[in-house]
């Protein structure tokens, strides 16, 4: 096994780079503990879900650099990057992650605004007369 495993995860416009080393289970995101960085408990749980499902919360130290997008996109990007790193270390976790769709990049992006409209799909008010 390599000393440091680095992977990339993306979601919406967020990009997360994960550096995973054998350790005691510390997760540092942008130089802050994960619980401190994701103040919302749900977003923190989404980001660390692969570790819980693989039952490896105490086996690795994880350092994450994440930028772009908002908190929701960033937590999804971190989750994908951690899942990819764990899949690299142990092939048996792939079977656990596949049904949960943790190794799949979510393709949904914001739809662009069209000209002649208020938003992507919302039109200006229409008057017959």
Curated annotation (Swiss-Prot):
GO terms for biological process: translation. SUPFAM superfamilies: Ribosomal protein S5 domain 2-like. One of its GO terms (cellular component) is small ribosomal subunit. It comes from the Bacteria. Keywords: Ribonucleoprotein, Ribosomal protein. One of its GO terms (molecular function) is structural constituent of ribosome. Coiled coil: none annotated. The keyword Glycoprotein does not apply. InterPro entries: Ribosomal_Su5_D2-typ_SF, Ribosomal_uS9, Ribosomal_uS9_bac/plastid, Ribosomal_uS9_CS, Ribsml_uS5_D2-typ_fold_subgr. Belongs to the universal ribosomal protein uS9 family. NCBIfam families: PRK00132.1. This is Small ribosomal subunit protein uS9. The gene is rpsI.
């Amino acid at each position: 096994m390599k000393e440091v495993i680095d992977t990339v995860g993306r979601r919406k416009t967020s990009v997360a780079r994960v550096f995973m080393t054998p350790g005691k289970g510390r997760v540092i995101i942008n130089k802050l503990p994960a619980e401190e960085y994701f103040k919302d408990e749900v977003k923190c749980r989404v980001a660390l879900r692969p570790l819980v499902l693989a039952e490896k919360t105490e086996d690795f130290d994880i350092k994450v650099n994440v930028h772009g997008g908002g908190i929701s996109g960033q937590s999804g990007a971190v989750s994908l990057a951690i899942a990819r790193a764990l899949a690299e270390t142990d092939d048996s976790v792939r079977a656990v992650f596949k049904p949960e769709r943790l190794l799949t990049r979510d393709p949904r992006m914001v739809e662009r605004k069209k000209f002649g409209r208020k938003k992507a799909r919302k039109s200006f008010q229409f008057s017959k007369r």
